[in-house]
Amino acid sequence: IAEDIYDLTNLPKKGNPFTYDAFLAAGENNNAKLIAAYFNQNGLEAKYIHPKDAGIFVTSEPCNARILPSSYDKIEELRNHNEILVIPGFFGITKEGQVCTFSRGGSDITGSIIAAGVKADLYENFTDVNGIFAAHPGIIKNPHSIPELTYKEMRELAYAGFSVLHDEALVPAYRGKIPLVIKNTNNPNHPGTRIVLEHSNDHVTVVAVSYTHLRAHETD
């Protein structure tokens, strides 16, 4: 880790649009190494895997990278591992070998990409709330968490201002037809919100209400 941090100081300060991304990605990358080491020290067989080795190759768009479709064949090979795999989120590698970060919520995007690549049965995304609330808790007192949403409803809410999960993080899991569950790291026994292709209950009417600049958005 110390060597990696030192290497950052040798990157060109001017003329390289990827230098900023390399610094942004360093924290996530080094945390993944520490977590893998912690697991191993506590008797859990774990392995740190760099995004390059995982096959997460992206477009050359600093701070706005997008996964290359050809990456998924390599990512699927992660299924061959038996260890706990610790893969840093938030960034991928360009074909030229440059670190390039995803947009805001990039770690969620990485999780969704990997879930789609390995054809996971479920993608669990842990955050600091009990799923998606039916209304903004800063405006409505004690709103209930929504047990189930469709991907379409979740994208509409994300676009309208619900910021628990970046809307771009929904796309890989949706295309892979993988259910996604948003759960609370500090309350893991709470069921959270499950995001699916279609509702199991056909009688759902209003799901949630949000607003942007005094314009109301209602999903059904």
Where in the sequence are the language-model features?
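A conserved active-site cap/scaffold subdomain adjacent to cofactor or substrate pockets
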Residues: 158, 166-194
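Flexible hinge/switch segments at interdomain interfaces of large molecular machines
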Residues: 205-211
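A broadly conserved detector of short glycine/acidic/proline-rich loop/turn motifs that flank catalytic sites
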Residues: 52, 90-91, 184-186, 199
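Nucleotide/pyrophosphate-binding catalytic subdomain
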Residues: 1-170
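Conserved small/polar residues in nucleotide/adenosyl-binding loops
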Residues: 212-220
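Self-splicing inteins and homing endonuclease
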Residues: 56-63, 187-203
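Active-site proximal loops enriched in glycine and acidic residues that flank catalytic Cys/His/Asp
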Residues: 127, 184, 218
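Charge-rich, low-complexity amphipathic helices
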Residues: 60-62, 137-138, 176, 180, ...
